[in-house]
Amino acid sequence: MSMSDPIADMLTRIRNAQMVEKVSVAMPSSKVKVAIAQVLKDEGYIDDFAVKTEGAKAELNIALKYYAGRPVIERLERVSKPGLRVYRGRNEIPQVMNGLGVAIVSTPKGVMTDRKARATGVGGEVICYVA
């Protein structure tokens, strides 16, 4: 059976792994998932990630991050879904928790944070909120 929303699956795997305090989580890899993982790493929400390729299948391993025994990611919420895509122009990109969190946006210039998209002057599809 094919998966209807692989990005939502990725976010759910991260959320579930952090609830049971796993050190890392593995999932099927794709270019968009790797780009999202890179943004999460750059913003300090995860420790590291690696893509392991075996034959035709690639697996994305994400090392989760904790602070004082609690997960660094408190909120991980999918915004744009396959049934209802959410696009925002460069002046309409939302702030998460008044700038304390991050909105991950897929733009023509790649996947980036809301702050970088505003600074670059591009809009795009709001993938998720992270706080």
Curated annotation (Swiss-Prot):
Quaternary assembly: Part of the 30S ribosomal subunit. Contacts proteins S5 and S12.
GO-annotated molecular function: rRNA binding; structural constituent of ribosome
GO BP terms in the entry: translation
Keyword Lipid biosynthesis: no
Name of the protein in question: Small ribosomal subunit protein uS8
Similarity remark: Belongs to the universal ribosomal protein uS8 family.
Coiled coil segments of this chain: none
Role played: One of the primary rRNA binding proteins, it binds directly to 16S rRNA central domain where it helps coordinate assembly of the platform of the 30S subunit.
Superkingdom, natural source: Bacteria
Keyword rRNA-binding attached: yes
